[in-house]
Amino acid sequence: MDLPGNDFDSNDFDAVDLWGADGAEGWTADPIIGVGSAATPDTGPDLDNAHGQAETDTEQEIALFTVTNPPRTVSVSTLMDGRIDHVELSARVAWMSESQLASEILVIADLARQKAQSAQYAFILDRMSQQVDADEHRVALLRKTVGETWGLPSPEEAAAAEAEVFATRYSDDCPAPDDESDPW
């Protein structure tokens, strides 16, 4: 009787074998760098220093878009695609209820997302405008297309949304932050 075997028992996967004969990892897959040998990054004393500099350069290239509420209790930073990178809270949020804090974080995060996506809109529009030689009619069509096709807010729309939220959500009688004791 001929029983079906396990597909992994054959040598069909030798081309994607990431481990050497001794079982040690032979290759690494880095989403930024790609696939490379695991032995190459740490060979030589100068490469450690160069690797650290490359990480620093990469970190500096990441654009963050931050929105802080007027009372300066919540600050949200997002990446260009609108994903939240981090949220900073002032010590004064201890006086807020959980639902108030959650609501505040969501409102500020949405404004930060719009701000970041408006930068994405401006970047795409700038690159595409270069392709049409800055012809005003074509740029106007591009502006409409970028906004409608990708659903990205323009910088003007993002600024208007922030101004509207700040005007309606926060009154002028909100207490001014104490700059000496405030960590922000």
From Swiss-Prot:
UniProt effect for mutating W150R: Absence of EspD secretion. Decreases EspA levels
**When this gene is knocked out, what is seen?**
EspD deficiency results in decreased cellular levels of EspA and EspC, but does not affect their transcription.
Cellular component per GO? extracellular region; peptidoglycan-based cell wall; plasma membrane
Question: Which cellular compartments is it found in?
Answer: Secreted
Task: Give the record's keywords alphabetically.
Answer: Secreted, Virulence
What induces or represses its expression, per the UniProt entry?
Answer: Transcriptionally activated by EspR. Repressed by the MprB/MprA two-component system, by direct regulation and via EspR. Up-regulated by the PhoP/PhoR two-component system, via EspR.
Q: Where is this region: Disordered?
A: 33-56
Q: What is its main location?
A: secreted
Tell me the Gene Ontology biological-process terms attached to this UniProt entry. protein secretion by the type VII secretion system
Entry superkingdom: Bacteria
**Function per UniProt:** Required for ESX-1 function. Required for the maintenance of adequate cellular levels of both EspA and EspC. Facilitates EsxA secretion.
- Give the multimer and partner information: Interacts with EccE1.
Name of the protein this chain belongs to: ESX-1 secretion-associated protein EspD
The organism named in the record is: Mycobacterium tuberculosis (strain ATCC 25618 / H37Rv)
Show the taxonomic lineage. Answer: Bacteria, Bacillati, Actinomycetota, Actinomycetes, Mycobacteriales
